[in-house]
From Swiss-Prot:
Keywords linked to the UniProt accession: Ribonucleoprotein, Ribosomal protein, RNA-binding, rRNA-binding
One Gene Ontology CC term in the entry: cytosolic large ribosomal subunit
Family: Belongs to the universal ribosomal protein uL14 family.
Protein name per the record: Large ribosomal subunit protein uL14
A GO biological-process term: translation
Function (record text): Binds to 23S rRNA. Forms part of two intersubunit bridges in the 70S ribosome.
GO molecular function, one term: large ribosomal subunit rRNA binding
CDD domains: Ribosomal_uL14
UniProt KW Metal-binding keyword: no
SUPFAM superfamilies found in the cross-reference section: Ribosomal protein L14
Assembly and interaction partners: Part of the 50S ribosomal subunit. Forms a cluster with proteins L3 and L19. In the 70S ribosome, L14 and L19 interact and together make contacts with the 16S rRNA in bridges B5 and B8.
Domain of life of the source: Bacteria
Gene name per UniProt: rplN
Amino acid sequence: MIQQESRLRVADNSGAKELLCIRVLGGSKRRYGNIGDVIVATVKSATPGGVVKKGKVVKAVIVRSKQGVRRNDGSYISFDENAAVIIKDDKTPVGTRIFGPVARELRDNEFMKIVSLAPEVL
């Protein structure tokens, strides 16, 4: 469950290391985001020489969440950390690699490029 001021790790090689959530997109009263939701965030720390610089406002999709998500068969999946992948306006990732596992729910939200780049889909 991601809300305003939540900090997330970046799971790609765009150059950013940590994000701070500014807003969860999808309605004016929307407070919380989970796996597959798009957020607006700012880059809090970045690696030198990366594509994304510190302080830049970006869009990102949540790929891992400690809260977890319920599946249709009744099972739950949760992760050890909150992580996101920085995306462009056309829902393609800025980076060329994805680190760590991602949830299968991204496939339902038309993030097939992220799913195909991920080393493991749970």
